[in-house]
Amino acid sequence: MFTEDKVTEIFFMADEFCGFFDSRMEKYALRDHKKRIYHRESTMSKSEIMVIIILFHNSGYRCMKHFYVEQVCRHMRHLFPKVVSYNRFVELERDVAIPLALFIKKVLLGKCTGISFVDSTPLRVCRNQRIHIHKVFKGIAQRGKCSLGWFFGFKLHLICNEKGELLNFMITPGDVDDRRPLEYKAFVDFIYGKLVGDRGYISKNLF
């Protein structure tokens, strides 16, 4: 777990980023003025929610609910005095999905050391038996195959260094070949030295 000083540092960076992000969205985002938007204001800020998500992924917990209830609500109330119920927190998570991804891309990525590793992992959106009735990601998620078999959803492509620091990531539909992201210059342009992957990444186009 991070120290309180480190949590405060991450919160400061996240809060500064959210302020900039919201100002850009307010200025440039397109709006549908025909629809009346009902928006329930949250007592927790976007930056607080982002920090809690970051803390969870560094905590060793496998269940977000257990982490939120046992750690945040019990032992971190002095850091997050306006915590909401877990159900409400889950609702608020979707509001920070885009700013969190951009925050990680711009602020939290590590640096290439000359030895990097690339791999992908499936992000399932539903069980295979429910594919035909799935609506949330209909038209976006696709059937894919990994070492564990067929799945329906997306693929998370990751590059990290030998210290375990995340260097870059990309999310694609499940049917995208693992080698495809490596063909995008922006995904690997900063990588130098050796890039290690399994045999699924062998391709003439990558050499």
Please place each PLM-identified region on the residue numbering:
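Short alpha-helical elements
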Residues: 1-207
